[in-house]
């Protein structure tokens, strides 16, 4: 069984490498709603974000909605990330199994820039006016274990981005499946994220006055007009991944993960990660993200988790660190409670 699992990991690695070396235009910066790509959970982030085949748990739903069908108990997750340039990212998820129906899931994602000074050519140090950039996504999902080996899930998201008095609102869908390949617990996961139509910004900040004929005199030189913005797609992403568990003893387990990614606004890449669990109390994690991506600025990730039971509930705290070539390192903390 271990040979089979290892061979499958190699297949995914080779596929991602072949895709990543292909000569293709990356289309970086050509999508809206890129905050949807910020992975919320510290567990997955510490594993290099190789999460499409992460074994069942509420933190896996972001990567693959199909894992929602594997959840066996109600759970609540809260995650906070100190993002670049003082930006904060917060995420709340709630999963509830309903006997005879399936599992339901709801989530709230919020990204906020804090106050930013308005600067103009005349006042480069600031006009005294401040504005904020705020992004919100509200999700509602459903997952079902179809057979003992196969589960699938679907999530709908209402997405809103606001820059001062200009905003865009749209709806996206996430869908995924996960399949257990053998009795050892090797999982194969596939997911599609942020599937939807194109969107564009509107708002009163786009209102201007317009002189239809600057050379004419006596006409209205301040006609009210509105600047139109182009429509852009959402940051779609395909994931295909494997997880391979290795049990050394009842008190020591290793989980290896690898996945290939195909985004619509960058080149193909690969994420890998490993998790070592000790005595169901402490977990050490490491990973590497966006391997083989053209001009990747990301790299190694590290983290840990501790868990324990209290009053019949399971509590888990996770931490993740991720490096960046040019910007500050990022830190995520996550709290999970399973009832």
Regions found by a protein language model. Give the residues of each.
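Short strand-turn segments of transmembrane beta-barrel domains in outer membranes
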Residues: 49-52, 74-84, 320-322
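Short, flexible, solvent-exposed loop/turn segments with mixed acidic/basic and small polar residues
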Residues: 5, 66-68, 305-309
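Outer-membrane beta-barrel biogenesis signature
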Residues: 20-72
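Alpha-helical transmembrane segments and their juxtamembrane interfaces
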Residues: 12-13, 74, 204
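N-terminal secretory signal peptides that target proteins for export/translocation
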Residues: 1-3
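Short, basic and Ser/Thr-rich N-terminal targeting/leader segments
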Residues: 56, 72, 87-88, 136
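Bacterial N-terminal signal peptides
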Residues: 7-16
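Outer-membrane beta-barrel porins/channels
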Residues: 25-48, 89, 93-339
């Amino acid at each position: 069984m271990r040979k089979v699992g290892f061979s499958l990991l190699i297949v995914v690695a080779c596929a991602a490498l072949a895709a990543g070396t292909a000569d293709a235009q990356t289309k970086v910066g050509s999508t809206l709603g890129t905050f949807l790509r910020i992975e919320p959970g510290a567990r997955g982030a510490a594993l290099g974000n190789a999460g499409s085949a992460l074994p069942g748990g509420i933190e896996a739903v972001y990567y693959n909605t199909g894992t929602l069908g594997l959840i066996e108990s109600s759970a609540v997750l809260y995650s906070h990330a100190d993002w670049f340039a003082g930006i904060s990212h917060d995420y709340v998820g709630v999963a509830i199994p309903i006997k005879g129906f399936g599992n339901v899931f709801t989530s709230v994602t919020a990204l906020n820039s804090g106050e930013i000074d308005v600067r103009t050519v005349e006042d480069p140090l600031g006009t005294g006016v401040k504005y904020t950039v705020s992004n919100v996504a509200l999700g509602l999902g459903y997952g079902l274990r179809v057979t003992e080996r196969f589960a699938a899930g679907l999530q709908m998201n209402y997405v809103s981005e606001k820059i001062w008095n200009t905003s865009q609102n749209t709806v996206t869908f996430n869908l995924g499946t996960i399949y257990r390949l053998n009795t050892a617990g090797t999982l194969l996961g596939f997911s599609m994220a942020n599937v939807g139509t194109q969107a564009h910004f509107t708002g009163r900040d786009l209102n201007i006055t317009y002189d239809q004929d600057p050379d004419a005199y006596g006409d209205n030189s301040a006609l009210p007009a509105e600047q139109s913005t182009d429509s852009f797609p959402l940051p779609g992403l395909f994931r295909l991944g494997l997880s391979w568990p290795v049990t050394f003893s009842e008190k020591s387990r290793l989980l290896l993960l690898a996945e290939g990614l195909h985004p619509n606004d960058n080149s193909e890449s690969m994420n890998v990660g490993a998790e070592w669990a000790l005595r169901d109390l402490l977990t050490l994690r490491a990973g590497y993200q966006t391997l083989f991506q053209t001009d990747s600025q990301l790299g190694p990730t590290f983290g840990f988790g501790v868990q324990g039971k209290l009053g019949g509930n399971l509590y888990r705290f996770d931490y993740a660190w991720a490096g960046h070539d040019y910007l500050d390192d990022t830190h995520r903390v996550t709290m999970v409670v399973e009832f």
